[in-house]
Each structure stands twice: as C-alpha cells, then as structure tokens.
C-alpha cells in the first residue's frame, strides 16, 4: 500500500501545477519509471532522462524480451511439430528454453552496466522451480504409460517423489557434515546452502561438457570443410545408426528378418520402414517414447543419406573439371556454376576460417579457466581493452558467453549417457516431446552455473555476482568449488584430444577378441581363421572394411531412392 500511496502523492505533486501537455507527458513517464523501478541505462552514455530517452529505453527492453522469444519459437519449430505440444506442457517447454536465452543476453549487459537484483532473483528462482520441480513432473506425465490424465498425474507424482526424497536425504547428509564435522553451517544461511549445492551440481556437468565442446566444436567444423573427411565420418557412423534403427524396429516386434546389414544394401530403409508399418499394426504407446524413437532414427538416417549423396555429387563435379554442380534435391534452385563456387570454394574456406576462430576462442577461455581470479585471465584482459566503448564491451562479452553456451549445449546433445539414448534432439521436427522437456530442464540447470563461470573470468563487479556469487562464497565449500574446480576443465579436453573413449572401446574389443581366440584354440579350431584381418576390422571403426560397410549402406539406400 505504501508504494501505491507514494505513486499517488507523486502524481498529485506533478499534476498540481500542470501547464501544458509536455509536463503531463513527463509526469506519466516519471510515475511509470518510479513504479516499475526500471534502471535507465542510457544515462551511462551521457543522455539526460527525458521522455524520448525513456521511450527508447522501454523499446530496447521490449526487444530484449521479444528477440529471445522469437529465436526460441524458431528453435522449437526446428526440432518438433508445434501441434505435438499440448497447451500446458508447451508453455513450460517454452519457458525452459526461453529463460536461459534471456539470462545469456542479460549477462553481457550486467558486465558493462547493472541489471537489477530483483531481476536476477526472479530469474534464478524461476529456473530453479522449472528445472527441479515443474519440468521433471511434466516429463514424467508425458512418459507415463497410463491412458487417463489422473493416473498419469499420479504416476508422475510418485516417480518424482522418490527422486525428491533421494535429493532430500543427500541434502541432509551434507548439512549434517557441514554443521557437526566442519562447523561451518548454520540454519540461518540455508538458502545459500541450497544455491551452493545446485551450483555445484550444475558446475560438475558444465566443466565436463564445456571441455568436451571446446575440442569437438572446432574439430567438427574443420572436418566439415573437407569433403573426404566428412564422407569418411558419415561412412563410419552409417553402420551404427543403421544397426540402432534395426534394433529399435526389432524391439517393437516388427519383422526383423526383412532388414539386415548385408541385405539392407539392396533395399531402402525408408521403404522397409513404410512397408513394415502398413503390414503390421503398431501401438505408439507400446514404449515410453512410442513411435518417435523410430522416427528420430529414420530422420537421422535419411539426412545422412542426403548429405552423402551431395558429397558424391561434389566429388564428381570436381573430378570432371566442368565447374558445374547440379543439385536435384536442393530446396532453392541454384545455377550450377554458382553452386559449384559455393560448395567447392566459398563454404569450405568459411568453415576453415570459422574453425580457426572458434579454436582461438577455446584457447582463450581455457587459459582464463586455468588462471581463474588472477590478472592473467585472457578474457579479463580482452574486456579491459574495450572499457571505453560500452557497446563493444557488451558485444565481446556476448561472443564469449554465447560460445561457451553453444559448446556446452552442443556437447550435451551428443554426449552418450544412458538417458540420452532415449532423449535425442533430432532436427527436421523429428524430436519427441519428452526429449524436448528433458533438454529444457537440463538447460535451466546448466545456464546459471555456466554464466557465473563466465562472470568469474572477468574482473568487473556485477549484480549477478552480488546475488549468486555471494550466496556461493558465503560457505567455505562453495567458495572452494567455484575457485578450484574450473581448473579441472583440462581433463575433458585431454580426454577429447586423445579420443579416450575410442581407445577404451578398442581396448575392450581387443580383450574380447583375445578371449574368443583363446577359447577357440582350446576347442581345436584353426587360430588363423579366427584372428584374421576381416574379423579384426569389423570392430575397428577406422578400418577399410568398416568404412566399406558404411559406404555400401549409404550408396545402397541412395540407389534405392533413385
């Protein structure tokens, strides 16, 4: 009531001696700004507080809210059919993707200017409620096998109740340890403990995903610039994707004898897919994600075949020396000479330059992580060079934080954890609703720790650090984690550079082959036939036999389509 009373008194004082419309206009704007408490950022640039400046300010804030909403809708339309999102889950999915985008845009502004603490409090608790309560509940509802809404609500409630009880037990263990063992915890700062625990949980995955993305994103862009490497990558992935598609179809009791890795060369997988569905009844609710799992793999396979076909056309055009490239499946008709120049010269050169730029960004951020909270942080040194230009400082900060966000999310999409086998984001609107809800909840959990990690790389005080960082640093455990753990980013980088996962897989395959060889020799079989190069090469994803198998699958499907 007091705020409304103050606004009313301000109106009376303003309108008491009103003489013209200009004073009325200024009074309305001052009352509006007083009520909303909107910080006028243009005053930092030397502009006086006038109605015109306030109008420009509000239009800028409106654009700041509408641009992320537009990109969020485009992103959702890229991965899922809009009609598949029913009203209430669709709203929460939109919020789960929209709020991290807004936070990413506000961080560069907060580095240069000041964003209100009330905004950060609202955004933090909104992401907290979305990621830990609402989105898991909606996801459980969408994945429930029951048919009625009431039974699905009950099923989702009991599933999440077990999860929350486990989290509560772990939280109580941490509180007891801090309170009685270290004597650094009091119940007066329970809110700070919750913020620290959620921050550590998010940072634990952010550093791993960020380090993996710093290697994967530039390397993948570099490989795309060379058609030979891109073709080899598709050939190497073809057998795995085709095998997963076969396994999914077999798990849904579709005829498994109609498809195999050898006979599949003479039949299109899409033709098999269509004929299987027309000849046999299929219940979409027979599995947690229903038919969408098969559709996602089928879409991935079709896009691989389409891209491999384009690579073959580019190779043929380069070998012919005609400087003409004909693309019959192109959405936009392009002149053959223009298509040749774009796909052979312009696009590869752009990808090479862009991969070098992203590799440089990765090196700068990794060095800054190693020298965190020191004067040797390269991100802080670069931002200090642009202190005289606020717009340039915001732009450079946005480049760094968006690149970190892109590497983290890209690594999250490709990380082969157990849940991600069912929660996969597939473009061309082949993603199921449960996968989109799952990734929206993960983005909400990872965005704030990621943004705070970026804020720690630069020396300027921010309102985000005042709310989020001081709550973390209030506890010795949170302070230790925020200052020491980011240096472990070198571990996932080293693992990605040496392809540790591939080497471990090859080691396991070699042990399996050795055991099978010894078992066969004890049964008086011929050792040479079991240790032949063909058997060995079937497990080697870089061998000529493995690549030839993938090439045959891709070309066989392509010829079937033709």
Curated annotation (Swiss-Prot):
Membrane topology: Multi-pass membrane protein
Tagged with keyword Transferase: no
Cell compartments where the protein resides: Golgi apparatus membrane
Cysteine disulfide links: none
Keyword Protein transport: no
Transmembrane segments: 23-43, 56-76, 88-108, 122-142, 165-185, 199-219, 330-350, 352-372, 381-401, 480-500
Cytoplasmic side: 44-55, 109-121, 186-198, 351, 402-479
Main location as per UniProt: Golgi
Keywords: Golgi apparatus, Membrane, Transmembrane, Transmembrane helix
Lumenal topology ranges: 1-22, 77-87, 143-164, 220-329, 373-380, 501-562
GO CC annotation terms, alphabetical: cytoplasm; Golgi apparatus; Golgi membrane; membrane; plasma membrane
UniProt cross-references to Pfam families, sorted A to Z: LMBR1
InterPro entries given in the database record: GPCR-associated_LMBR1, LMBR1-like_membr_prot
PANTHER family: G-PROTEIN COUPLED RECEPTOR-ASSOCIATED PROTEIN LMBRD2 (PTHR21355:SF0)
Entry similarity comment: Belongs to the LIMR family.
Name of the molecule in the record: LIMR family protein C622.11
Upper taxonomic lineage: Eukaryota, Fungi, Dikarya, Ascomycota, Taphrinomycotina
């Amino acid at each position: 009531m007091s705020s409304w009373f103050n606004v009313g008194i301000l109106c009376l004082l303003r309108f008491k001696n009103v003489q013209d419309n200009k004073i009325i206009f200024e009074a309305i704007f001052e009352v509006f700004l007083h009520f909303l408490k909107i910080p006028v950022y243009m005053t930092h640039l030397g502009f006086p507080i006038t109605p015109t400046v306030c109008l420009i300010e509000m239009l800028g804030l409106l654009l700041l809210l509408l641009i992320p909403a537009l990109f969020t809708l485009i992103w959702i339309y890229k991965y899922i059919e809009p009609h598949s999102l029913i009203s209430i889950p669709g709203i929460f999915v939109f919020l789960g993707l929209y709020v991290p985008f807004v936070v990413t845009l506000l961080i560069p502004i907060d580095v240069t200017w000041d964003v209100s603490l009330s905004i950060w409090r609202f955004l933090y608790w909104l992401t907290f409620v979305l990621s830990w309560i609402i989105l898991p509940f909606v996801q459980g509802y969408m994945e429930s096998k029951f048919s009625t809404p009431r039974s699905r609500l009950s099923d989702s409630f009991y599933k999440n109740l077990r999860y929350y009880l486990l989290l509560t037990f772990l939280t109580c263990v941490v509180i007891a340890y801090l309170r009685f063992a270290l004597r650094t915890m009091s119940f007066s700062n329970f809110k700070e403990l919750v913020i620290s625990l959620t921050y550590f949980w998010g940072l634990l995955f952010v550093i791993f995903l960020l380090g993996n993305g710093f290697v994967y994103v530039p390397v993948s862009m570099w490989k795309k610039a060379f058609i030979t490497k891109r073709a080899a990558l598709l050939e190497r992935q073809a057998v795995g994707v085709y095998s997963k598609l076969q396994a999914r179809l077999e798990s849904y009791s579709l005829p498994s004898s109609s498809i195999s890795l050898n006979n599949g060369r003479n039949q299109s997988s899409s033709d098999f897919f269509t004929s299987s569905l027309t000849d046999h009844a299929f219940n979409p609710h027979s599995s947690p994600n229903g038919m969408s799992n098969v559709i996602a793999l089928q879409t991935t396979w079709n896009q691989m075949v389409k891209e491999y076909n384009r690579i073959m056309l580019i190779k043929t055009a380069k070998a012919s020396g005609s400087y003409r490239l004909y693309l019959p499946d192109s959405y936009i008709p392009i002149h053959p000479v223009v298509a040749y120049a774009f796909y052979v010269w312009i696009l590869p050169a752009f990808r090479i330059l862009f991969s070098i730029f992203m590799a440089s960004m990765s090196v700068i951020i990794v060095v800054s992580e190693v020298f965190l909270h020191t004067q040797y942080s390269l991100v802080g040194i670069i931002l200090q060079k642009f202190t005289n230009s606020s717009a340039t400082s915001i732009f450079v900060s946005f480049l760094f934080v968006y690149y970190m966000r892109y590497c983290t999310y890209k690594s999250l999409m490709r990380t082969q954890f157990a849940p991600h086998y069912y929660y996969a984001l597939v473009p061309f609107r082949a993603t199921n609703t449960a996968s989109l809800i799952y990734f929206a909840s993960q983005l909400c959990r990872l965005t704030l720790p990621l943004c705070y990690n970026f804020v720690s790389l630069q020396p300027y005080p921010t309102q985000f650090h005042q709310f989020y960082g001081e709550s973390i640093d209030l506890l010795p455990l949170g302070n230790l984690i925020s200052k020491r753990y980011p240096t472990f980013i070198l571990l996932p980088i080293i693992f990605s550079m040496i392809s540790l996962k591939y080497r471990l897989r090859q080691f396991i395959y070699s042990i399996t082959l050795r055991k099978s060889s010894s078992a066969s020799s004890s049964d008086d079989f011929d050792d040479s036939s079991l240790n032949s190069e063909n058997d060995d090469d079937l497990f080697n994803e870089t061998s000529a036999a493995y690549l030839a198998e993938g090439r045959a699958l891709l070309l066989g499907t392509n010829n079937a389509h033709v």
